[in-house]
């Protein structure tokens, strides 16, 4: 009936709002850990070094995306940087990557060659391997975009499903019978991150 449809719509809207709020906290933690770890290991311009990546074509695509996001940025700290520095063309990672999307950040992490640094980041989130964090970041990006663009969450199937380990160090769900293509799977990942 119509009232049920309205109630489901309202529930979904509230769910999106709550998830978006939580995702912001996770995104900030991911962003700061990635920027810090890779900058300490490889310098402030690691994201511009194609010798540090697995796939040079993806590196070029990521660099172009970063450049577009920098050009669109209206952030004071980016404008201030441009006023004072002509070279290099990009500000250091802690400025540049502050304005990139979660999707771009996820792609940078995925393509980065230094598996030891990636594993250290994954371990900070209590995850055993960087591949698990990569899959969770891709799924989180899809969830974040659904929330930001007011797409339905209830009963959604994910294009990028997260890797679901049977056991993790922290409090984790029993994944027996869990369909990791459904949005509930990434909800479980979000709960674990918190």
Model-based region annotation:
Residues 1-194:
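Long, contiguous internal "core" modules enriched in hydrophobic/ aromatic residues
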